[in-house]
A protein has these predicted regions:
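Membrane-interface extramembranous regions
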Residues: 2-122
Length: 122
């Protein structure tokens, strides 16, 4: 039986593109929270909307950098796994504020982790 073989970088490219998308989501949400922080005054765990906006902006930039590194093939496996794991926790903490977006963000982070872990690092 013959199976189709893929290069070991396919999973990393897929995960890198997903991290780029997640970084863009986090940047958009972060800027939205900074712009409209008065609309979400008491809906956040541990802090206010402006603080969460800055957290999401910084985290989005980090995810964007990790996604670019992973998609280009220049490393970033550990960074991608770490950021995807932290991203799942962050999106879960925003579950009651953005339920649909949180579920999508958590699912994409899980896909990044599954893709990176299922790809042979050699």
């Amino acid at each position: 039986m013959t199976t189709a073989s893929t290069t070991s970088k396919d999973g990393y490219t897929f995960a890198g593109v997903l991290l780029l998308v997640l970084g863009a989501f986090n940047l958009i949400d972060g800027f939205m929270l900074l712009d409209r922080s008065e609309l979400f005054a008491d809906a956040y765990v541990f802090s206010n909307a402006s603080t969460w906006g800055w957290i999401l902006i910084v985290f989005g930039v980090c995810q964007f950098v990790a996604g670019a590194m992973l998609a280009r093939g220049s490393g970033g496996r550990t960074m991608a796994l770490t950021l995807a794991g932290i991203g799942m926790v962050l999106w879960f903490m925003l579950l009651f504020t953005f339920p649909f977006a949180s579920l999508i963000g958590t699912a994409i982070n899980f896909s990044v982790i599954a893709s990176v872990l299922s790809t042979d690092p050699n």
